[in-house]
Amino acid sequence: MPADVVFRPPRIRSKPRLMGIQSALVVGPPGEEIYTDKYGRIKVQFPWDRKGKKDDKSSLWIRVATPWAGKQWGMIHIPRIGNEVIVSFLEGDPDRPIITGMLFNADNMPPYGLPDNMTQSGIKTHSSKNGSDDNFNEIRFEDKKDEEEIYIHAERDLNCVIENNETRKVGFDDKKDGDQSVEIYNNQTLK
């Protein structure tokens, strides 16, 4: 063997594998509520990490799985600091962790009191930075028989862009609370 070649014994053992899933806590720098990079990755601390400080140095960036992802389109929900997440490992490789879900727990309860509201489903966000439990956006579906409802709450503004036609059918009353101002920039025809 030439003197300038470093001797390395052959690898006898295969790379370790992590099968199954683990839970972890989303972490970031002090004072932040959301911490991510341009790819939507986050940092976590595993419960077995006794030396971690639950900050932005607790792990490397970890990718977050989503049901739908493409070039400049898809779904995005960045787990926030303090959320409990599920971590899997691609092909069992401990160097390739991926966030595959989030969990409710005693510190982060579901948005609708259960089991009383078990017929409700939806999306409820939390205003950031420093929003309270009263600051949120929400789309909620009530599926209880004879009380079915789709509820939309915008904490501030609701903007709707319709590129073509809008058709609505209101079976009974069409109520608008508060003052209203209507601006028409071109023509309007009422029948």
Give the positions of each predicted feature.
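OB/S1-fold single-stranded nucleic-acid-binding modules
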Residues: M1-L18
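Structural signature for extended repeat/solenoid scaffolds and their inter-repeat hinge/linker regions
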Residues: A3, L18-K191
